[in-house]
Amino acid sequence: MAHQGLLLVLSGPSGVGKGTVKSAMVKQKAFSFEYSVSMTTRKPRPGEVNGKDYYFVSEDRFQEAIKGNELLEYNEYVGNHYGTPLAPVQKMLNEGKDVLLEIDVNGAKQVRKLMPDGVFIFLTPPDLHELKHRIVNRGTDSDKVIAMRMKQARKEILMMEDYDYAVVNDTVANAVDHIKSIVEAEHVRVPRVINDYRNMVKED
């Protein structure tokens, strides 16, 4: 019985480990998600690959995408733009494929308005001390940027109430296990499968 794919939105404050958790999810065979690659104007970090981690584009190209309604969501964060190309997401969901979006909290809010049936998970740190430790250890930000990220994180954590689930990223393995349980439960929720069974009954 074919049905619409599941849209999973993974969000949380900067430095919480969204990218690390996402990568671990993609590697696990238990997950069958298609990953939507975001577009950004920020410079690549060491090890990041264009077209795999992000589409790294110029500011002019990003503005062109906004004007052409090519983005599901977009936002500016610490001087850089981030956005999710719309067409690939729609195509994969219509084909019955599950799609994983890893985006910031403002982007998630935009997606919620356009695709309210998505599953929204807020990834949170064990505490703010650990969050700052992770940002500092990343070694890519100045003290000024780190302070900006921590100030923003305090605001973003309070936005958790707009999500369906909260997952603590104490360890990547634990976070992935919790998300796996959420995905399994969401796939068998009656609102998601009832039409399949209605059609099955009609066919008989």
Swiss-Prot record:
<keyword id="KW-0418">Kinase</keyword>
<keyword id="KW-0067">ATP-binding</keyword>
<dbReference type="GO" id="GO:0005524">
    <property type="term" value="F:ATP binding"/>
</dbReference>
<dbReference type="GO" id="GO:0004385">
    <property type="term" value="F:guanylate kinase activity"/>
</dbReference>
<keyword id="KW-0963">Cytoplasm</keyword>
<dbReference type="InterPro" id="IPR020590">
    <property type="entry name" value="Guanylate_kinase_CS"/>
</dbReference>
<protein>
    <recommendedName>
        <fullName>Guanylate kinase</fullName>
        <ecNumber>2.7.4.8</ecNumber>
    </recommendedName>
</protein>
<dbReference type="InterPro" id="IPR008144">
    <property type="entry name" value="Guanylate_kin-like_dom"/>
</dbReference>
<comment type="function">
    <text>Essential for recycling GMP and indirectly, cGMP.</text>
</comment>
<dbReference type="InterPro" id="IPR008145">
    <property type="entry name" value="GK/Ca_channel_bsu"/>
</dbReference>
<dbReference type="InterPro" id="IPR027417">
    <property type="entry name" value="P-loop_NTPase"/>
</dbReference>
<feature type="binding site">
    <location>
        <begin position="12"/>
        <end position="19"/>
    </location>
    <ligand>
        <name>ATP</name>
    </ligand>
</feature>
<comment type="similarity">
    <text>Belongs to the guanylate kinase family.</text>
</comment>
<dbReference type="Pfam" id="PF00625">
    <property type="entry name" value="Guanylate_kin"/>
</dbReference>
<keyword id="KW-0547">Nucleotide-binding</keyword>
<dbReference type="GO" id="GO:0005829">
    <property type="term" value="C:cytosol"/>
</dbReference>
<keyword id="KW-0808">Transferase</keyword>
<dbReference type="InterPro" id="IPR017665">
    <property type="entry name" value="Guanylate_kinase"/>
</dbReference>
<feature type="domain" description="Guanylate kinase-like">
    <location>
        <begin position="5"/>
        <end position="184"/>
    </location>
</feature>
